């Protein structure tokens, strides 16, 4: 899969599905989009480097 340098262009739902698809545990409850963007950067964009 292709990991974005700037995941904030994705919708919140898309961010969540990408995280789940890569076995990243989502925080409980509904979070603000930037929480998922941060998770994406830490978990997925970091893997690419």
Curated annotation (Swiss-Prot):
It comes from the Eukaryota. GO terms for molecular function: DNA binding; hormone activity. InterPro entries: LEM-like_dom, LEM/LEM-like_dom_sf, LEM_domain. The keyword Acyltransferase does not apply. Residues 32-36 are annotated as: Biological activity. Residues 4-47 form the LEM-like domain. Gene3D superfamilies: 1.10.720.40. Keywords: Hormone. The keyword Membrane does not apply. Belongs to the thymopoietin family. Hormone of the thymus with pleiotropic actions on prothymocytes, mature T-cells, the nicotinic acetylcholine receptor, and pituitary corticotrophs. This is Thymopoietin-2.
């Amino acid at each position: 899969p292709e990991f974005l340098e700037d995941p904030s262009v994705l919708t919140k739902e898309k961010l969540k599905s990408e995280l789940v698809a890569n076995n990243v545990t989502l925080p409980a409850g509904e979070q603000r989009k930037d929480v998922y963007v941060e998770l994406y950067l830490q978990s997925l964009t970091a893997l690419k480097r």
